[in-house]
Amino acid sequence: MRRVAPALFLLLVACSSVVLYERAESDTLYFGTGKPDGSAVTAAEWQQFLREEVTPRFSGFTHWEAHGSWKDVPEESHVLQLIHPPGHEADVAAIIDTYKKRFQQEAVLQVRGDVWLRLR
């Protein structure tokens, strides 16, 4: 029994340190800011879009400004990173469709992947 107890103890310690990750999906969306009339989506318009369209659908997200190009034309853009449980495809599609209509955009680039996450 004295030999089994240390082995059992080590097994319990090893099992207690197992870190569990949760499956999720990651959507990274790239929004161009150039409008057909030559103007650009303003910072205030972008913040309003986030407030009205993104925040009600996702409780947390990250966004940042970027410099990109579309069809060889450089333009400022916004990148939106969404990490969410599976099953939010309709919410992501609604955000994309609304942005395209509101700001007269041809397209929004969407990059999707499966991820494993945990909060530490």
Which stretches of residues belong to each language-model region?
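Glycine-rich, aromatic-bearing surface loops/beta-hairpins
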Residues: 18-24
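Terminal, regulation- and interaction-focused segments at domain boundaries
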Residues: 24-43, 80-83
